[in-house]
From Swiss-Prot:
Tissue and organ distribution: Expressed primarily in brain.
Annotated stretches, region: Disordered: 15-84, 400-566
Biased composition (Polar residues): 486-529
Biological process, per Gene Ontology: neurotransmitter secretion; synapse organization; synaptic vesicle clustering; synaptic vesicle cycle
Origin organism lineage: Eukaryota, Metazoa, Chordata, Craniata, Vertebrata
Additional free-text comment from the UniProt record: Regulated by calcium.
Region span, A: 1-28
Domain notes: The A region binds phospholipids with a preference for negatively charged species.
Gene expressing this chain: Syn3
Region annotated B, chain positions: 28-90
Biased composition (Basic and acidic residues): 550-566
Protein name as it appears in the record: Synapsin-3
Modification(s) after translation: Phosphorylation at Ser-9 dissociates synapsins from synaptic vesicles.
Length: 579
């Protein structure tokens, strides 16, 4: 290759070139979808008047351009990245499930997902919603609400959900667990997660998670109240101690809770449980001094103390005094441990009772539907809004239709099967078959199976016949994809090597391994056969470059092909410079 570059840059070499050789190198590449036949190549000669004005540089530039264009045939599948026009992102729809007492749109006013996507807030209660969920189509929500005496009917596909309402309550005959299932069916992200919302539809089920934490941390770090569960009224015979608190089913805000002072009242309540056809729990009554509530919203913690003024055993009934207390490490451990249940709770609260004997008892944990109390209600709502925006920015990927800039642009393997590009030859990275020797007989000692002759070798046959197959007549279809690397590697040689004779080419090639005499017998028919010497010279030059490059990718078992390639290269140059 170094010799070829030096030889082509010599001005005296161009003067001795036969007519028709330069057009073969300068002819533009034919379309990959319709390969040119040899007759077509010979039908369109090009004038060389402009080329001889600077023979050495013109020939070298034409040859370099031909070599540069070589890998574009197999890599024609690569498409340059087109400039992406800015796409206006649609606003993300946030569905807030809460009553109408709180207008959540004002807490999300001016907030954007990832700083550039608007948030549209839709607010409704569970009773005002209906939906249809699909495997691939997501979830379509139908909303019918009444605002200021006007009925609003709207259908939309939410992107995120904030649950601020209980999905199930036996006391109010409200069961919206089917809606939670539909939202989960549609794969919608939520705060808290829909998985945890569904699990919080049963208080004994949640209490079982508290029992796990109790066994993990111990009674000193996690003082859980002693409780007994009954699936129905039949096992409810008696209680070990009185008074006891009986909780029927799943209810909120103190509903379904009864204080029983003696055995007779206990038996009466058992009959009520039988009529309710539900489960029940009993726990020892704790004479409390005050109630404790520790809430967690994201990474914000608050602790409150509530003291009954009216003297009712339920602190949420009658008059009570509420004040915020210091957040201790003990309280933080409680709420952090509870926030890990059901895959994680972004919003939760732990309720405990501080008895008059100075001991604490954890009685309940609440999720995102917890009521907000204290003087910092507005701050807590703003914290919830910030938490939702943060979760939306993490979970919702904007511009999913726009390809990522980190994705490399390259050829797609599935395009290689198209019929128009199937004639481009093997793709990059795939081994190419090596051609047999030009004009010489097959070697009998070769262990390889017989291979068919390539179209370019059919034109170089001694009989000079036309090729039978019309495929691949253009030079770029015979070149190897690795030829540009070969030309760049040879470009680093010293310029003073240009004075070496032509015979020095054989010193750069590896000696043949076997079958030398067989190939020498085919040299004479090769020199005297073809009726189109100029075309054959250009094709043999291109073919030699292709075979010399593909020999670098051969395996040790193909020494015969390497030797044939070397002989083909020598014969090509011998026929090229014979004039």
């Amino acid at each position: 290759m170094n010799f070829l570059r030096r030889r082509l840059s010599d001005s005296s070499f161009v003067a001795n070139l036969p007519n028709g050789y330069m057009p073969d190198l300068q002819r533009p590449e034919s379309s990959s979808s319709s390969p040119a036949s040899p007759a077509t190549e010979r039908r369109h000669p090009q004038p060389l008047a402009a080329s001889f004005s600077s023979p050495g540089s013109s020939l070298f530039s034409s040859f370099s351009s031909a070599m540069k264009q070589t890998p574009q045939a197999p890599t024609g599948l690569m498409e340059p990245p087109t400039p992406v026009t800015p796409v206006v992102q649609r606003p993300r729809i946030l569905l807030v499930i809460d009553d109408a007492h709180t207008d959540w749109s004002k807490y999300f006013h001016g907030k954007k997902v990832n700083g550039d996507i608007e948030i549209r807030v839709e607010q409704a209660e569970f009773s005002e919603l209906n939906l249809a969920a699909y495997v691939t189509g997501g979830c379509m929500v139908d909303m019918q609400v009444v605002r200021n005496g006007t009925k609003i009917v709207r259908s939309f596909k939410p992107d995120f959900i904030l649950v601020r309402q209980h999905a199930y309550s036996m006391a109010l005959a409200e069961d919206y667990r089917s809606l939670v299932i539909g939202l989960q069916y549609g794969g919608l992200p939520a705060v808290n997660s829909l998985y945890s919302v569904y699990n919080f539809c049963s208080k004994p089920w949640v209490f079982s998670q508290l029992i796990k934490i109790f066994h993990s941390l111990g009674p000193e770090k996690f003082p859980l109240v002693e409780q007994t569960f009954f699936p129905n009224h039949k096992p409810m015979l008696t209680a070990p101690n009185f008074p006891v608190v009986i909780k029927l089913g799943h209810a909120h805000a103190g509903m379904g809770k009864i204080k029983v002072e003696n055995q007779h009242d206990y038996q009466d309540i058992t009959s009520v449980v039988a009529m309710a056809k539900t489960y029940a729990t009993t726990e020892a009554f704790i004479d409390s001094k005050y109630d404790i509530r520790i809430q967690k919203i994201g990474s914000n913690y608050k602790a409150y103390m509530r003291t009954s003024i009216s003297g009712n055993w339920k602190a949420n009934t009658g008059s009570a005094m509420l004040e915020q207390v210091a957040m201790t490490e003990r309280y933080r451990l409680w709420v952090d441990s509870c926030s890990e249940m059901f895959g994680g709770l972004d919003i939760c609260a732990v309720k405990a009772v501080h008895s008059k004997n100075g001991r604490d008892y954890i009685i309940e944990v609440m999720d995102s539907s917890m009521p907000l109390i204290g003087e910092h209600v507005e701050e807590d709502k703003q914290l919830m809004a910030d938490l939702v925006v943060s979760k939306m920015s993490q979970l919702l990927v904007p511009g999913a239709s726009v390809p990522s800039p980190l994705r490399p642009w390259g050829p797609q393997t599935k395009s290689a099967k198209s019929p128009g590009q199937g004639q481009l030859g093997p793709l990059l990275g795939q081994p190419q078959p090596r051609p047999p020797p030009q004009g010489g007989p097959r070697q009998a000692q070769s262990p390889q199976p017989p291979r068919s002759r390539s179209p370019s070798q059919q034109r170089l046959s001694p009989q000079g016949q036309q090729p039978v197959s019309p495929q691949s007549g253009s030079p770029q279809q015979q070149r190897s994809p690795g030829s540009p690397q070969l030309s760049r590697a040879s470009g680093g040689s010293s310029p003073n090597q240009a004075s070496k004779p032509t015979a020095s080419l054989s010193s750069h090639t590896r000696p043949p391994v076997q079958g030398r005499s067989t190939s020498q017998q085919g040299e004479e028919p090769q020199k005297t056969a073809s009726p189109h010497p100029h075309l054959n010279k250009s094709q043999s030059l291109t073919n030699s470059l292709s075979t010399s490059d593909t020999s670098h990718r051969g395996t040790p078992s193909e020494d015969e092909a390497k030797a044939e390639t070397i002989r083909n290269l020598r014969k090509s140059f011998a026929s090229l410079f014979s004039d």
